[in-house]
Each structure stands twice: as structure tokens, then as C-alpha cells.
A protein has these predicted regions:
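Active-site-proximal beta-alpha core segment in soluble small-molecule metabolic enzymes
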Residues: 1-33, 39
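Short, charged, surface-exposed secondary-structure boundary motifs
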Residues: 1-2, 96-99, 214-217
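Conserved, mostly hydrophobic/aromatic
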Residues: 18, 61, 110, 153, ...
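Catalytic alpha/beta core domains of metabolic enzymes, predominantly
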Residues: 29-176, 180, 184
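Catalytic-core signal marking the mid-to-C-terminal active-site face
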Residues: 173-185, 202-203, 209-214
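Nucleotide-binding motor/catalytic cores of P-loop/tubulin-like NTPases across gene-expression machines
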Residues: 191-220
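Generic C-terminus detector
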Residues: 215-231
Length: 231
């Protein structure tokens, strides 16, 4: 059956993705190798060899695990062993908060090392949020050349405006529009670090007493009261 599928895919010019999911590996298969990452890599290569023998060379590989250190190590290992395109993902990552962190660490680490060709963020959530997290990972690594880069500070004793509320409202407003090139928006809380960060952004605010300075592409446009900063 595998040979028939491989031959049909080859004739139609359709690639096949080999997916090794840690949750589907049998106990006796783990025991054949020195480590779980090694097992995942070798099992994928065994399947790739089977497809190659059947005449299919258009192959992509994914090695997914909910244990992020194993996932990272498995992809590093497979990258050493073959030149097949790699599809990155962390399986069973969980709900939005923890799952986003897992995906960002696992996928982001590998992409930063130059490993990986496509990605899939998995969350127990709306698929739209999966896409949003994936876009942010690519954006943070400079691999996506459109969308918003949003900068805001953690607040400190110098903050004199309700920065948290302002930052949340700005982020919500930005979600309604996606620019075709990277644009940076900075919402900063004080007059010490704020002006520099705000001036470096395409659009920035540096908070002060009862309001803030507005910068557009490094140019100071004026001081506005806190109630008008969002507008």
C-alpha cells in the first residue's frame, strides 16, 4: 500500500510529509535507540527510505513532541542527517497561554538556528489564534516582512499614565489592520527611556505627567493629554 501511494504521489507531482509524533511511537521502538530525539530522527529516516525506494523523492519531515527539549533535539539531529525540508511544530502544546510559549520556544529556537522550512503552531484554541502566534514568531525573528512590531515597557515608578490600559487598547486597535510592510509602534511609560524607544518606532508615545509625547518616524509631533493619546 505504501508503494502504491508513493508511486501515485510521484506521478502526480505531490509531496508526502512524514510525521513522527512522540505520542505514537511504540515502547519497543524507543528502546532501539540511545535517546528519544535519536529515535524520532531515525524512525523518520526509515520511512523516508521506504518512500525513496518506491520512487518518491518529494518528501518533507516533521518530528513533533509535547516535550520541547526533545522536539528541539530531534530536529537538530535530523538536520544533521538529511537534507529533506523540515516542517516544525510542537504537538499537544496546550491552551493559548502555555501553548504559545511552548511553540515560541521550540519553533523559534530552531528557526533562529536556520533549521526548518515551514511551521505549524498547535494550540487548544481557535485556529485563527494559531496563525496569529505563528505570524508573531516569524515577525520577532525577522522572517516575516509585514505586520506590526509592538513595543511597550513593563512600567516602573517613573510611569505617570495608565500605560497598561493604553498599551492594551493600542494592541487591540492594531489587530484590526495589517500593514503590508513591517511597522513598529512603541508605547512607553516615562521620560527616561521612553523618548528614545518612541523615536525609533514608526509611531511612538513616551508617557509623562498626565500625557505623553507623540513621535512619528522619529519626529516629535507634540505633547498630548492622556485622554487623547489613543486617538
Amino acid at each position: 500500500k505504501v508503494r502504491a501511494v508513493a508511486q501515485a504521489a510521484s506521478s502526480a507531482g505531490i509531496p508526502i510529509r512524514i510525521g513522527v509524533n512522540a505520542g505514537s511511537v511504540r515502547p519497543e521502538q524507543w528502546q532501539q535507540f540511545a535517546s528519544r530525539p535519536e529515535a524520532m530522527a531515525q524512525l523518520a529516516l526509515q520511512q523516508a527510505e521506504m518512500l525513496e525506494d518506491a520512487g518518491l523523492s518529494a518528501i518533507k519531515i516533521s518530528l513533533k513532541s509535547s516535550h520541547i527539549p526533545d522536539m528541539i533535539a530531534a530536529y537538530r539531529r535530523i538536520a544533521q542527517l538529511c537534507d529533506y525540508p523540515l516542517h516544525l511544530g510542537a504537538t499537544e502544546a496546550g491552551t493559548w497561554f502555555r501553548g504559545s510559549i511552548k511553540n515560541a520556544i521550540g519553533i523559534g529556537t530552531l528557526l533562529a538556528e536556520g533549521i526548518g522550512d515551514t511551521i505549524r503552531v498547535s494550540l487548544t484554541d481557535d485556529p485563527v489564534r494559531e496563525v496569529e502566534v505563528a505570524k508573531e514568531i516569524l515577525m520577532m525573528l525577522g522572517l516575516r516582512h509585514s505586520g506590526w512590531q509592538f513595543v511597550s515597557c513593563p512600567t516602573c515608578g517613573r510611569t505617570e499614565i495608565d500605560l497598561i490600559a493604553l498599551a492594551q487598547k493600542v494592541e487591540q486597535a492594531l489587530a484590526l489592520y495589517e500593514p503590508q510592510r513591517p511597522l513598529t509602534v512603541a508605547v512607553m511609560g516615562c521620560v527616561v527611556n521612553g523618548p528614545g524607544e518612541a523615536a525609533d518606532a514608526d509611531l511612538g508615545v513616551a508617557g509623562g505627567r498626565n500625557g505623553g509625547l507623540l513621535f512619528v518616524r522619529g519626529e516629535k509631533k507634540g505633547f498630548y493629554p492622556e485622554s487623547e493619546l489613543l486617538e
